[in-house]
Structures are given as structure tokens and as C-alpha cells.
A protein has these predicted regions:
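An acidic, gly/pro-interrupted, aromatic-rich
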Residues: 1-118, 160-170
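Structural motif corresponding to the C-terminal cap of alpha-helices
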Residues: 81, 135-138
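Amphipathic alpha-helical segments that form the core helices of the histone-fold
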Residues: 125-136
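Intrinsically disordered, low-complexity Ser/Thr- and acidic-rich flexible linkers and loops
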Residues: 137-145
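Globin-like tetrapyrrole-binding proteins
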Residues: 156
Length: 170
């Protein structure tokens, strides 16, 4: 049956998809969450706390929560650390927006990183239409094209990381 990814695995997967990294205090840059030596790093990572990285008060793996919660959904939708990963100047969305590849190739790259598969024809069509559609700001004024493409790729990364296929082992 499908099970949600463990907190550390999900954080590393989000970093892979977003093309970013999470730095932890007193550890070398690029240390992955799955390699954290102990639970003291939970306090510096709201993501790990919200997604249930155990405090290791016992040796039982049963201490780890696997249920989904409203706070987890809200964290993926609104949290500053997630928004920062999406908007990173060196992140995947920014790199894809600047890339000379065809839009279809860029979207295939996102799907391969997120799901280890190419998008279905329907998924590809929907994503391409979204990326190339004219974007407007809250007042209805057109957004500058480079910014619109960058924000469209940020939205696609965000949408993919919020799917069941991304968050769950099957």
C-alpha cells in the first residue's frame, strides 16, 4: 500500500526536484537530510519537525509518524523554506527558464527528476500550455515574458512536489 515518504527522504527529494540544497548547522554544505547524525537537527528544520522526523526518545521505529496532516499540506503550500527553494536563483526552475531547450524537453526533465518517468501526452500538453500561456499580475497587467516563464516553471515544480506520486512510495 502507498506510504508517505519519511521526512528526511522527502526533504532530499524536494531539494533534488527544486535543484537546491538544505544546509544544516555544523555539517558540511550539501549534507543530505537522510545522513543527519542525530535528532538535534530537527530544531533547525521546520520541515523535519512538521513531517515527523522522530525525536529518538526510544529505539523503536514506531516513534515515527506516517500519517498526513493539515500542517504538512500547509507547509508544502505556504512555508518560507519551500518558497525559497522554488524561487532560488540557482534552482531548477530558474535554470529551466533560462535554458535554450524546447519547452517539451524542459518539462520532460522535471518529470524525470520528480517521478523517474516522462510525462504522459496529456500531462505534457497541459504543462506546455501553462508555460507558454500569457501571464498577468494581480491587476491584470501582462508580466514580462522572462519572469512569466520563470514563475511558470516554479509553479510546475511546486505542483509536481505536491502530488501523491511524488510524496508516496508505491
Amino acid at each position: 500500500y502507498p506510504r508517505r515518504l519519511q521526512a528526511e527522504v522527502m526533504l532530499d527529494a524536494i531539494d533534488d526536484l527544486a535543484g537546491t540544497r538544505t544546509d544544516f548547522p555544523n555539517l558540511p554544505p550539501g549534507t543530505r537530510a537522510i545522513a543527519l547524525p542525530d535528532n538535534s537537527y530537527n530544531t533547525s528544520s521546520p520541515f523535519l519537525r512538521v513531517f515527523g522526523r522522530p525525536e529518538n526518545e526510544s529505539v523503536c521505529e514506531c516513534e515515527r509518524g506516517q500519517s498526513s496532516s493539515l500542517s504538512q499540506s500547509l507547509h508544502l503550500m505556504n512555508a518560507g523554506d519551500i518558497r525559497g527553494k522554488l524561487a532560488s536563483g540557482s534552482g531548477r526552475a530558474e535554470q529551466l527558464a533560462k535554458s535554450e531547450l524546447a519547452v517539451e524537453q524542459k518539462i520532460e526533465e522535471l518529470y524525470l527528476v520528480a517521478f523517474s518517468r516522462k510525462p504522459t501526452p496529456a500531462e505534457l500538453q497541459t504543462a506546455v500550455e501553462y508555460v507558454i500561456s500569457p501571464q498577468t499580475d494581480a491587476a491584470g497587467a501582462p508580466i514580462e515574458p522572462a519572469r512569466a516563464v520563470r514563475e511558470a516553471f516554479q509553479d510546475l515544480v511546486w505542483a509536481l512536489m505536491n502530488t501523491r506520486e511524488f510524496m508516496f512510495n508505491h
